[in-house]
């Protein structure tokens, strides 16, 4: 990037057809670059360009920094509120992130403010959670009303879930987008 203009993304799907995954389609949109996918064993190629693809909020595969709990929040705000949340620099891997979660740092930088524990939870509030009981705030979910959250846990598909006692106990802080 510092030495020349990036004109496309080339990558392979070993032992699989070159059909784009949800993450490929999302990355293509995010980077605004054409993608070329090859299956090395067969030399089959697939080419595609940004086309306005929007990821579904429910049922997406978990991929760090592309389709994870934080990207679910930003995608919900874009799709439901027409608000584009700025990206903030995150560690390159989930392992690095787990050692030093940065949600408390990142949320205020992109327009969220912590809300008082006495305030009612509203649709669109971000719930900052400690899911490992280690004191590290390692997960975010989105309150969508009617005691329901939208979330994307590691190695699971994104889903709506009841905001029950388990998730309430994991919730340590709540943030609201300050428009």
Locate predicted features.
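Active-site nucleophilic cysteine motif
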Residues: 63-80
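Divalent-metal-activated hydrolytic enzyme cores
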Residues: 30-54
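Short, flexible active-site loops
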Residues: 52-62
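Short HxH-centered metal-ligating active-site micro-motif
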Residues: 1-24, 28
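...with weaker cross-activation on analogous glycine-rich loops/strands in unrelated enzymes
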Residues: 92-158
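Conserved beta-strand scaffold positions in the cores of enzyme catalytic domains, especially
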Residues: 9, 35-37, 174
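Short acidic alpha-helical/loop segments enriched in Asp/Glu that coordinate divalent cations
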Residues: 82-95
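Glycine- and charge-enriched low-complexity intrinsically disordered segments
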Residues: 161-179
């Amino acid at each position: 990037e510092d030495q020349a203009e990036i004109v496309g993304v080339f990558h392979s799907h070993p032992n699989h057809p070159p059909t784009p995954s949800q993450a490929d389609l999302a990355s293509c949109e995010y980077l605004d670059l054409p993608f070329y996918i090859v299956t090395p064993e067969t030399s089959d190629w697939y080419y595609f360009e940004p086309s306005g693809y929007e990821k579904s909020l429910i049922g997406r595969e978990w991929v760090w920094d592309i389709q994870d709990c934080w990207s679910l929040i930003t995608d919900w705000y874009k799709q439901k509120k027409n608000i584009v949340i700025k990206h903030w620099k995150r560690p390159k891997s989930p392992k690095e992130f787990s050692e030093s979660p940065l949600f408390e740092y990142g949320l205020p930088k992109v327009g969220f403010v912590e809300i008082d524990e006495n305030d009612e939870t509203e649709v669109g509030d971000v719930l900052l959670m400690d899911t490992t009981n280690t004191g590290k705030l390692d997960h975010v979910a989105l309150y969508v009303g009617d005691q329901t959250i939208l979330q994307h846990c590691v190695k699971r598909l994104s889903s709506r879930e009841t905001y029950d006692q388990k998730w309430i106990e994991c919730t340590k802080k709540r943030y609201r987008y300050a428009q």
